[in-house]
């Protein structure tokens, strides 16, 4: 990967025709000039046997090539709302190489007033142009959209969840050959199950032959409007219920900081019973600081973990927007020297959807300031937190038992997720503790939250300055930390007056050797979400969303390479490789 590939090129639209937008790159329309919505219903919804195919299903997955304006997503969403099975969940996973911006999508949606409510909700979460999967969740309707923004083959290679129906809605095959290649058809087959249906406008001969060669049974059907024919296809075999839930029963979440709260929130909105456990209560550890800044991770690279962490920042921003304790406002980052200023300018060029370089500071317009305890409490507002210390976990029957220090089994669950911050080291030794302090001073906060190595922002009671980073779990002297804060502010923000200290906070973070989180399975019945360091509020929600999806057998929220970058087993694998190389030498 190269930095030039971090974002997709935007769609270039021609609005000169009254029928709607055309893609300049392909010289083709996004939808029918006659009635694009009814065409979507006929070709894709009815063409894939919907809604009958999801009747009685707990979980259903629809895949699409060619998200375009999002019209098919809205048509599918509307039908799902009207016919959703009890407690059903619909995953819509779609691919788009050239994303539309929010304003263009809104202009296109204006043609269908009957979809205005759904269109407004979709536009509220409209993603950036970042490559890779972007997860949008609408829990009140049991509906999630995962938009893979990339080349079709690259996107399909990162998908792992089988699909129950495919919408092939790319531009005309002769104008967009990359979307209609044999490699694409073969991958569609690999991601299908017996009974998977395919709907598409085209009847091009090489498309019929390509789908058939991939293993589909293909047939022509009457077309829509003036189009005489269209194609339907099915993966052979008796249709199966593709609901692949990996956990049958309650899930215990150990830890009630931002990691645990994000997990409980993601699981409960999917209807999964949860048991939240923390010996000290909600937001009692590192997630209980007076204030914090939500900013994207700054890294001059285009690698799987960079895409994943940027997608996580975007997801967290959407999740927190409008919640108690979150304040959407730009954050600026001051460079420490000329070399870092040059780096920031380059980063702003590479990440235009996330960063602006003013010549003096790096501004993150989509960032924010938050009150951690309020945010965490809001995410678990409908969940009870059990105050118990768990000393050991053991298999118990078909599930797992959680025992306290006295040896009593306190909880029996189907699955356990360890999200206990620094306390997770008991279960995952590769975590590294880092103690830290913050102080709240009397005085007016800066005009904009500002970071430079330390940071300063508004907090209840005055202006917060943080944070120290001390190796290990021992917090340094308070007077030394305070003197350091005052000296740092005097040097970098001389106009910020700090009065007497009004409050202090200290805690212990948990990080990993490569400074990336760990998220995934430790064993069949135990998973982990930890090692978030000082970026828990930016990264935890999407990692929790991905883990919740995995437990219910849904579509992952991360690309496969992104999941591998966060995999809990990576450090053991690296040690094994080094040992093997040493033995070979």
Swiss-Prot record:
It holds the Pfam family Methyltransf_30. It catalyses: 5-aminomethyl-2-thiouridine(34) in tRNA + S-adenosyl-L-methionine = 5-methylaminomethyl-2-thiouridine(34) in tRNA + S-adenosyl-L-homocysteine + H(+). GO terms for biological process: methylation; tRNA wobble base modification. SUPFAM superfamilies: Nucleotide-binding domain. It is found in: Cytoplasm. It comes from Maricaulis maris (strain MCS10) (Caulobacter maris). Residues 1-236 are annotated as: tRNA (mnm(5)s(2)U34)-methyltransferase. One of its GO terms (molecular function) is flavin adenine dinucleotide binding. In the N-terminal section; belongs to the methyltransferase superfamily. tRNA (mnm(5)s(2)U34)-methyltransferase family. The gene is mnmC. It comes from the Bacteria. Residues 564-585 are annotated as: Disordered. Catalyzes the last two steps in the biosynthesis of 5-methylaminomethyl-2-thiouridine (mnm(5)s(2)U) at the wobble position (U34) in tRNA. Catalyzes the FAD-dependent demodification of cmnm(5)s(2)U34 to nm(5)s(2)U34, followed by the transfer of a methyl group from S-adenosyl-L-methionine to nm(5)s(2)U34, to form mnm(5)s(2)U34. Its EC number is 2.1.1.61, 1.5.-.-. This is tRNA 5-methylaminomethyl-2-thiouridine biosynthesis bifunctional protein MnmC.
């Amino acid at each position: 990967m190269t930095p030039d590939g971090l974002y997709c090129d935007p769609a270039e639209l021609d609005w000169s025709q009254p029928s709607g937008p055309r893609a300049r790159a392909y010289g083709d329309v996004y939808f029918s000039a006659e009635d694009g919505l009814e065409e979507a219903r006929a070709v894709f919804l009815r063409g894939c046997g919907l809604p009958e195919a999801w009747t009685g299903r707990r979980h259903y997955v629809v895949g699409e090539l060619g998200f375009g304006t999002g019209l098919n997503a809205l048509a599918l969403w509307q039908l799902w709302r009207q016919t959703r099975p009890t407690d059903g969940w619909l995953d819509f996973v779609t691919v788009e190489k050239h994303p539309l911006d929010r304003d263009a999508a809104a202009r296109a949606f204006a043609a269908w007033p009957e979809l205005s409510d759904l269109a407004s909700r979709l536009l509220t979460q409209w993603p950036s142009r970042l490559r890779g999967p972007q997860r949008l969740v609408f829990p009140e309707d049991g509906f999630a959209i995962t938009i893979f923004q990339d080349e079709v083959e690259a996107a399909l290679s990162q998908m792992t969840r089988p699909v129950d129906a495919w919408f092939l809605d790319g531009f005309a095959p002769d104008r967009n050959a990359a979307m209609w290649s044999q490699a694409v058809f073969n991958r569609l087959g690999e991601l299908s199950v017996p009974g998977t249906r395919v709907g598409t406008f085209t009847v091009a001969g090489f498309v019929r032959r390509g789908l058939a060669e991939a293993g589909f049974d293909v047939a022509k059907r009457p077309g829509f409007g003036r189009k005489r024919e269209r194609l339907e296809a099915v993966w052979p075999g008796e249709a199966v219920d593709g609901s692949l839930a990996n956990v049958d029963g309650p899930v215990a979440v150990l830890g009630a900081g931002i990691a645990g709260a994000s997990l409980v929130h993601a699981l409960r909105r999917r209807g999964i019973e949860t048991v939240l456990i923390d010996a000290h209560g909600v937001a009692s550890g590192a997630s209980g600081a007076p204030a914090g800044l939500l900013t994207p991770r700054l890294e001059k690279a285009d690698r799987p973990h960079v895409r994943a962490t940027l997608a996580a920042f975007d997801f967290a921003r959407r999740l927190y927007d409008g919640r108690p304790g979150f304040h959407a406002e730009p954050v600026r980052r001051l460079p420490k020297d000329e070399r870092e200023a040059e780096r920031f300018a380059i980063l702003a060029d590479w990440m235009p959807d996330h960063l602006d370089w003013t010549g003096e500071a790096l501004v993150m317009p989509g960032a924010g300031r938050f009150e951690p305890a309020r945010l965490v409490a809001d995410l678990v507002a409908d969940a009870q937190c059990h105050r118990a210390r768990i000393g050991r976990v053991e298999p118990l029957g078909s599930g797992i038992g959680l025992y306290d220090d006295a040896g009593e089994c306190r909880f029996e669950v189907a699955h356990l997720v360890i999200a206990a911050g620094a306390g997770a080291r008991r279960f995952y030794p590769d975590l590294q503790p880092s103690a830290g302090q913050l102080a709240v001073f009397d005085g007016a906060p800066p005009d904009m939250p500002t970071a430079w190595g330390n940071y300063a922002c508004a907090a209840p009671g005055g202006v917060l300055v943080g944070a120290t980073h001390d190796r290990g779990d021992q917090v340094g002297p308070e007077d030394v930390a305070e003197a350091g804060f005052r000296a740092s502010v005097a040097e970098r923000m001389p106009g910020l007056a700090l009065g007497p200290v009004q409050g202090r906070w200290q805690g212990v973070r948990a990080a990993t050797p490569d400074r990336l989180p760990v998220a995934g399975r430790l064993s069949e019945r135990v998973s982990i979400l930890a090692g978030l360091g000082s970026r828990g509020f930016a990264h935890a929600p999407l990692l929790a969303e991905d883990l919740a999806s995995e437990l219910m057998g849904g579509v992952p929220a991360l690309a496969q390479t992104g999941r591998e970058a966060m995999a809990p087993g990576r450090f053991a694998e690296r040690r094994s490789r080094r040992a093997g190389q040493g033995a070979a030498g």
